[in-house]
A protein has these predicted regions:
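A residue-level marker of the well-folded mature domains of exported/periplasmic proteins
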Residues: 1-157
Length: 157
């Protein structure tokens, strides 16, 4: 989904990926982000819980844009954060409890997203009004089902 979204704006964009295999090692994430910055990236996006704080720190040090994950991370880099993907775990837990109470819980993969209120995107004031509008239009289309985000769980190098 992330790469598809980026390519919808710029088909020639190159998305680089790095894996830290950690959700807590901020130093490792900072080193991975620094290597990507040295390789020419101009935006850092992480999906690594506390580990991602290191990636944000690298973006701040290099004075490039970054994107938060899991919660509103704008306070970590007020001048650099473009947006934050927010996971509303209370919605996920409520759905799970509801299925147990309704006696229809199954051991399966449950895909909850924006339409369910489980995920949202907080757009920062570092974005121009035009970019905010474009992003919000895409968000609204995802929520309504007009735009479907392909789920691809393939690991990439």
């Amino acid at each position: 989904g992330y790469e598809d979204g980026a390519k919808s704006v710029n088909p020639d964009i190159e998305v680089q990926t790095a894996w830290t295999n950690s959700f807590v090692d901020t130093q490792l994430a900072q080193e991975a982000a620094k290597a990507m910055i040295e390789n020419g990236v101009d935006v850092i996006k992480h999906c690594a819980n506390a580990c991602g704080n290191g990636a944000i720190a690298a973006a701040v040090d290099a004075d490039i844009w970054c994107q938060g994950d899991s919660y509103d991370q704008s306070s970590l880099a007020p001048e650099n954060i473009l947006d934050s993907a927010i996971y509303n775990l209370d919605v996920v837990i409520d759905k799970a409890i509801e299925s147990v109470v309704d006696d229809n819980f199954e051991g399966d993969v449950y895909n909850l997203g924006m339409a369910d209120g489980a995920v949202e995107v907080l757009l920062s004031d570092n974005l121009t009004d035009e970019v905010k509008k474009t992003a919000q239009d895409a968000i609204d289309k995802i929520v309504s089902g007009e735009l479907e985000v392909e789920r691809d769980y393939t690991l990439r190098d």
